[in-house]
Amino acid sequence: LRERGAVEISTVANEKVEDGSFSLPGYDIVVWFVGDESSANIVFSPAEKAAITSYLNGGGKLLVSGSEIAYNLGRTGAAAIDLPFFNNYLKATYVNDGSSSYTPATGQAGSPFEGLTLPFGVVYPEDFPDAIAPTGGATTVLNYAVLPNQGGIAYTGTFGSGILPGAVIYLGFPLETAAAQGMSL
């Protein structure tokens, strides 16, 4: 970002994406914070999933973080429509519902996050981070303190019917719970 000079940042409530009044295409990157949210076992509405799917199919780049995403979309008993979105667009599989002992997350050797230590659950408590595993060409970028559990995956390539390469970084914990003073490289 520093090399790009001026950076324009916009924020919008997910409900605006859901009702169609805000469109994701045209943005270089979308950062989607889910936090601890899972209302009635719904993390992404059908309209939100459709918007994200279209954005990634068109070569979009998505950073998404949250502790209930994998639990909601990827566990046994998840809605049949959720698993293909989770596997094919977030490029992950659900491993387990973790605990607060999973912090900090550390960068996977050989990944762009190598050497990073990222304590989470600091700004607000995070008691159930999702352990996830990469699928569909994704790779692990962050590991939890309780190994072999993984907390971050990344993928670059095409999605679905798309012909333009896009990218996703998916974190199984709320990134916004990390305190800057606890991060180290």
PLM region spans:
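Extended interaction regions within the primary functional domain
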Residues: 1-5, 78-83, 119, 123, ...
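Aromatic-Pro/Gly-enriched surface loop or interdomain linker
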Residues: 1-36, 161-162, 177-181
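A glycine-rich, often tryptophan-bearing local segment used as a flexible ligand/cofactor-contacting loop or short
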Residues: 37-122, 134-138, 146
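Short linear motifs in intrinsically disordered/low-complexity regions
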Residues: 15, 20, 88, 97-98, ...
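Short, solvent-exposed polar/charged micro-motifs at secondary-structure junctions
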Residues: 19-24, 104-115, 148-154, 181
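A glycine-centered loop/beta-turn motif at secondary-structure junctions
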Residues: 26, 30, 57-65, 121-185
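Alpha-helical scaffolding within the catalytic cores
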Residues: 14-22, 44-51, 148-157
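Structural alpha-beta junctions
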Residues: 2-11, 54-61, 167
